[in-house]
Amino acid sequence: YLGSIVTIAAVLFLFVVLFSSPVMADENTASEVNTTITLSNSGNVSKMTDGSYNTKTSFASGDSITVTGKDKIYSLYIKWDLVPDEWTLSYNGTTKTYGTNGFLHEYVEIPEGAETLTITFSSNEAICDLHAYSAGTAPSDVQAWKTPCDKADILVFATHADDEILFLGGVLATYGGEQDLAVQVAYMCEFTSSAKIREHEKLDGLWESGIKHYPICGDFPDLYSTSLEAAKKQYIYDDVLSYTTSTIRRFKPLVVVTQDLNGEYGHGGHMLFSHAVAESVESSSEPSYFPDSASKYGTWDVPKTYLHLYSDNKITMNLRLPLSRMGNRTSIEVQTAAYKKHVSQQWCWFYVSDDYEYSCADFGLYRTTVGNDSGNDMLENITTYEEQEKIEKEKAEKESVEASIAAEESSIADVKSNTSNSTRQSGRKIIIFAALILIVIIILFAAYRYYQLIQSRKRHRRHKRK
C-alpha cells in the first residue's frame, strides 16, 4: 500500500515538473535559424549581425541580400538604421512589398516558409541587425509591432524618449502591458537627426513595457531649457499645439496622460509640451481650433485628462502589484527593466520610482467630462473601446433576435388571421348553402302542396259529377 502511494506521488511530481517546465511552455516559440547571408555589393555582413545599433551595413537602390537558411525560414526581423522606404522580399517564386508601415524595427512573417529569401532595395538603405527564425511564435524580445491605434483607450504624450518610462511608466505597464488596452504613445521630440540610437532605445523600452502599437513622433528637435518662457523662444508654440491637437483628434482617446506642468525637474521642454496638451484638450472639440486637423479627423472632446504630479483630484497608482501578463513582475520592476533599454542615457541620475518627488505613480485629474474619481483607476467612469464594441455587438444581436421574434410573431398572427378569415368565409358559404337548400325545400314543399291541392280539387269535381 505504501509503495503504491510513493508511485502515485512520483508520477504526480513528474507530471508537475514536465508541464510546468519552461521547455514545455516555450516549445512553440520560434528559434533563430542559422543562415548564410550573401550581399550583392561589397558590404560587411558582420556589421548587421553583431547586435549593435552602432554598426550598420549600407545598400544602394537596386542592391540585394540573399538569405539562405539551413532550415526553412518562417520570419525575418530587421532593425533598420533609419525608417526604410518600400522594399521587396522574394521567395518561392513570389515577390512581396514591405516597408509600408514606417517601422524602424520590422518583423516579417513568411507563413509557408522558405529556404532562400532575397531582399531588394528601391532606395538607399542601411541595416543594423538582421535575424531569421523558424516556425512558431516570435520570441518575446522580437518586436512584432502593430500599426498605431485607430482609436486609443489611453493616449500618452511624452516629450522625449525615456520620459514615458521615468514619469509615466506605470500607465504603460498597468494599462498597456497587463490589461492589454489600446495604449498609444506620442512623442514631441525626434532623435533621427541628432542621436539615432535613441530611436532604437525608444522602441526597445516601449516593447519591454508591454506596448504593442507603434508610437508616433513629432518633428521637433531635442532642445534644453529651464523655463516655459525660454522653451517658447526655442520652439514655435503654435506648431506644438497643432501637433497635440491633431494627435488627439486622430486617436480620439478616452484618457489622455501627459507630463508635469512644472516640467518635473524643471525642464522647459516638458513644461511646453504638457501646457500644449492641456490647452489642446480644452479646445480639440471646437472645429475652428486648428481647422485643418478638424477637417481631416473630426473634432474630439477628451473624457479624462491626467497630468503627472498635478495637485488637484490626485490619484496614486499601485505599482507594487504583480502583473501576470508581465511575468509576475510589478510595474516598477517592468519600468526599471524598460529604462535600462535606454543604454545611452544610463549616465544620467534618473531612475524609476514610486516613492520620490518625481514618482511615476502620482497623477492628478486635470479635466473630466465623466465625473471625478473615487479610487485610483484612470479608467473609472470609462468604457473602453473594446467594451463599447462588445456592448454594441450584444445590442445588435439582441435587436436581431428581437426582430426575428417579432417577425415570427407577425407571421403567426398573419396565419391566424388568414385562418380566421378562411373560417369565417367557410362559415358564410355553409350558411348560404344551407339557406339555398332550405329555399329549395320550401319551394318543393310549396309545389307539393300545390300539387296536392290540384289533385284534391280534381277529385272533388269528379265526385260532384257522380
Q: Where are these predicted regions, by residue range?
A:
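The feature marks non-catalytic terminal segments
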Residues: 28-56, 69, 87, 103-110, ...
